[in-house]
């Protein structure tokens, strides 16, 4: 990726010259200049120069920058007036085991622990605050602790179209505004059809995205996301591995299948994935096999109990952050030669998510490609 380290505002107003315009050269014709402008790459010609920096969590390279939200009393979904009106309605949508109310003090300690883990690994941490009593046009915000809804792709932020949670409407817009106002990162696209929750998607190589067809995604929304981020990925190829988990709402306690890709599968190293077998249909498993991926299967009990053993966050190939109480799965990951940094995730799972879900990933370095995976010798 091109590194942009000088914002236009650092130049004196009278210091600009025609040579500062990328497409300009002495003697260029009007037609040649216009055509060159039309053909310029959006990410390297516009988005990154506007931001004055590189950004995007595409791929599985080293993670360098994130954002978190410190929970407040307004972060607790079960304290929402709408939730109290019909807890069974929301519990039916989510389907996860009920572990009781969220302990705010413990939730804040978990957040500090996670931030410390990032900082100890050289990752810059930003903090996102919401207004007092945050609400959208339909009621109080719910689930806005999950800053993955504001995750930044190469090219810019993406506005979600949520599949089934009315309390999330407006969250990705707010986080996109935060990214623009705080980091100068522009929006890339808004999903306007169907359903697409990009923050719960993930990548298993520099040019391989994982999505689902589920309560959170349909084909219309998926097509719109893939069309946008594939054009700004900076890779010659771009693949979308589409899972089809058997689940009506968010989570199926009987099987452990989830509507979100990042609860079902995540990269832990070059060509190594931690997976929930219940979410892998035949086509997905065949594609992974044919492309030389090694599958580390999560412990089925930990997956069904929504301990979120697959919801690890890759810091760099061969190093992940994981939930501390996923003992069996974490050992399997270690046995695969991967370093596991364990942090507490008790309260975030009560809020129906995991460690990876709550992190806005702002920037990753370019990392291993699908060619690297295909060339790996392991079987």
From Swiss-Prot:
Optimum pH is 7.2. The keyword Protease does not apply. Gene3D superfamilies: L-arginine/glycine Amidinotransferase, Chain A (3.75.10.10). The active site is at residue 357. It catalyses: 2-nitroimidazole + H2O = 1,3-dihydro-2H-imidazol-2-one + nitrite + H(+). Its EC number is 3.5.99.9. Optimum temperature is 24 degrees Celsius. One of its GO terms (biological process) is response to antibiotic. Transmembrane segments: none annotated. It comes from the Bacteria. It is an enzyme of class 3 (hydrolase). Keywords: Antibiotic resistance, Hydrolase. GO terms for molecular function: arginine deiminase activity; hydrolase activity, acting on acid anhydrides, in phosphorus-containing anhydrides; hydrolase activity, acting on carbon-nitrogen (but not peptide) bonds. Belongs to the arginine deiminase family. Involved in the biodegradation of 2-Nitroimidazole (2NI) which is a natural antibiotic and an analog of the synthetic nitroimidazoles used for treatment of tuberculosis, Chagas disease (also called American Trypanosomiasis) and cancer. Catalyzes the hydrolytic denitration of 2NI to produce imidazol-2-one and nitrite. It is also active against the 2NI synthetic derivative benznidazole. NnhA confers drug resistance to 2NI. This is 2-nitroimidazole nitrohydrolase. It comes from Mycobacterium sp. (strain JS330).
